[in-house]
Amino acid sequence: MRKNLIAGFTLIELLVVVAILGVLSAVGIIAFGSYTTSTKMSAASNTMQQISLAQTEHFADSDSYWVDGTSVCTPTEATTKKIIDEDKGLGIPISYKDISFYFCIYGDGTDYTIKALADYGSKDCEITFTLADQKAVRNDKC
């Protein structure tokens, strides 16, 4: 007498595998999201270093730092474009759309502060770079 043996998986086994894959996918998406956020913040900090180097060159040429105004500024696309402008700004290529940050520079010509504001997520992440400190400082919303 011959038995009919059908090999395969039960519905319960398939459901367990699908549930495990779902949990692993969720963890991966969360980890990837925080990775891209930290990458954007690092890129913004690097851009601020690039702006600072351009400021050093500008100071060597004109005996003052380039600023957009003396009062605290709010970084927008317009203020970022002023920094990029070769005639009116520092003339450095900033890929602000790729890193999702806007920049502005304020000060009195003998000192300057660079501000960066996130253009993604909650849009409250702000990074500040001062001539005195020479490092980028993030607020608590980053």
Where are these regions (language model features)?
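Alpha-helical segments that scaffold the active site and NAD(P)H-binding pocket
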Residues: S25, L53-A54
